[in-house]
């Protein structure tokens, strides 16, 4: 085989191994030998595939060029600069002056079905094609100067199956008639407006300026200061089907307040003030029917229907509505003077009726005492 020799260098004092073989004249290190032995002259599977693909491409490239030349024998013409209104019939008539036309292929836009400005024309012979190039190049067709040259292909490529999305813009979107940024903005605006109207804020014109300020309605002022109950009014029960704040979830969250934000927002709007005034002046049977058509679920949750709270607060119970309908006669002006309401709260009406009855009793007692005195004085006088 070979001999192993160890040489000591005096300068660096490093050990150097030299492998000598009778068949090889080169001295190689163990690392290079291992690399050499690891990678055999035979190619790896990756190199095999790579070499096979390279050989295929090299072997097929001349046949491809030959096939392309065979595909266009020389009678196919490439025409550019066409008008968008030109048709295949116009092209055929224009090139029929110089020879016989066998095929016309006009490339159209898939959306508008108009000409994209170029096409392919096949003549019967190569002589006719050369004649068309000499005479019709830079000619005028429908007001446009066209260019005629020899085509690389017989006709245009077959369009890729799928949907044509148009040209790509800088933002990565495709320009097509189906996409409209103005339309998307309007959709988002309408969604945002509908969402805000569902929440009840768009009903109040002064919501953004005043925020969560106190209510301007005397009805809510009386309810806020005189009513210990937290049950909604008949008007709020009527609107509970349109307002999300009266769902069980929002009722649990807003029990600490006497009324919800939507009620305050609607209370400031003149539209709802007019509706409330009209309803408070006339208690129609239709409104009472709507008021009584509350679901049993909400009626069970509403505290105004429980007997315990009827004893505490009689101002919004069904009995008080009956009392208000039959016994509230006189109109009263609100303390702020901003809105009029002819409905008097039952407690206030009862207090006024009691005070009137007391005054009447006092006046009658005083009249009776005066009449008694006058009678006694008449009887005593001679």
Curated annotation (Swiss-Prot):
Which SMART domains would you find in this protein's record?
A: RRM
Q: Which GO terms describe its cellular component?
A: nuclear speck; spliceosomal complex
Give positions of region: Disordered: 30-76, 150-382
Q: Which GO terms describe its biological process?
A: mRNA processing; regulation of RNA splicing; response to high light intensity; RNA splicing
Give any Pfam family that matches: RRM_1
Q: Where is the composition biased (Basic and acidic residues)?
A: 288-316
| GO MF terms, alphabetically ordered | RNA binding
What is its subcellular localisation? Nucleus speckle
Where is it mainly found? nucleus
**Tissue expr:** Expressed in leaves, stems and roots.
Tell me the InterPro entries matching this sequence: Nucleotide-bd_a/b_plait_sf (IPR012677), RBD_domain_sf (IPR035979), RBM (IPR050441), RRM_dom (IPR000504)
Keywords, ordered alphabetically: mRNA processing, mRNA splicing, Nucleus, Ribonucleoprotein, Spliceosome
**How is this chain modified after translation?**
Phosphorylated.
Miscellaneous comment as given in the Swiss-Prot or TrEMBL entry: The splicing patterns of the pre-mRNA are similar throughout the developmental period, but change in response to various types of stress treatment.
Q: Which PANTHER family match?
A: TRANSFORMER-2 SEX-DETERMINING PROTEIN-RELATED (PTHR48034)
Q: Subunit structure of this entry?
A: Component of the spliceosome. Homodimer. Interacts with PRP38, SCL28, SR45, RNU1 and U2AF35B.
Functional description taken from the UniProt entry? Probable splicing factor involved in constitutive and/or alternative splicing events. May bridge the 5' and 3' components of the spliceosome.
Family the entry assigns: Belongs to the splicing factor SR family. SR45 subfamily.
Know the name of this protein? Serine/arginine-rich splicing factor SR45a
